[in-house]
Design a protein with these regions (language model features):
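Hydrophobic residues in well-ordered beta-strands that form the structural core
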Residues: 2, 23, 82-84
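Aromatic/hydrophobic pocket-lining residues that form π-stacking "cages" and hydrophobic walls in ligand
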Residues: 71, 104-106
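Active-site phosphate-binding strand-loop segment of PLP-dependent enzymes
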Residues: 27-97
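A short helix->loop->beta-strand "cap" motif at the edges of active sites that frequently abuts
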Residues: 19, 77-80, 114
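Conserved core segment of the aminotransferase class I/II
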Residues: 111-169
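Conserved PLP-anchoring active-site segment centered on the Schiff-base-forming lysine
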Residues: 1-11
Length: 169
């Protein structure tokens, strides 16, 4: 499921693979109203993961800590993986996020759930125009979790090992 607006290539990748997806525009569901939208989609039981950009590309807004907490709570309630696209990591210039290991820190759903994958772009951070360099960070709990569907399709392993050795490789 896509929390829009988002990066259109992500939907294109899903379409190329022939999968269905759901999406909604977050502008209509800011703050506590986000819970309603997530509940509507996730309660059907057919969503395995959700993705959003924060700071957002292309609209350049940021989800609040309250909204990230709601996303984390819903991910826990419905056992859904949150893919957090942090392509513009630490580029919320309303506060100084430029000192590593010192507060304030990048806002992240990782504070509220263990069902997360963070995707961080080195290309943006190091201004490598055209080059694609990135980091994927998976929570320890999710990394070591086994899913019957992945075992059936890929022949075993934890989520993390399948992600690294089958999906990315």
């Amino acid at each position: 499921m896509f929390i829009d607006p988002g990066f259109p290539v992500q939907k294109q990748q899903i379409a190329v693979m022939g999968y269905k997806y759901e999406s909604f525009d977050v502008y209509e569901y800011r703050g506590e109203r986000l819970r309603e939208a997530l509940e509507t989609h996730l309660s059907k039981g057919n969503i395995a993961a959700m993705i959003y950009s924060n700071p957002n590309n292309p609209a350049w807004f940021c989800l609040t800590d309250e909204e990230l907490k709601i996303i984390g709570e819903m991910a826990n309630k419905y056992d859904v993986i949150v893919i957090e696209d942090l392509a513009y990591f630490a580029m919320d210039f309303r506060k100084d996020l430029g000192c590593p290991f010192e507060p304030p820190y990048q806002a992240s759903v990782a504070r509220y759930t263990d069902n997360y994958i963070m995707q961080i772009s080195g290309s943006k951070a190091f201004s490598y125009a055209g080059q694609r360099i990135g980091v994927t960070a998976i929570s320890n709990k999710l990394y070591h979790r086994s899913y019957p569907g992945l075992t059936q399709r890929y022949g075993g392993g934890t989520f993390g090992t399948v992600y690294i050795h089958r999906v990315l490789y």
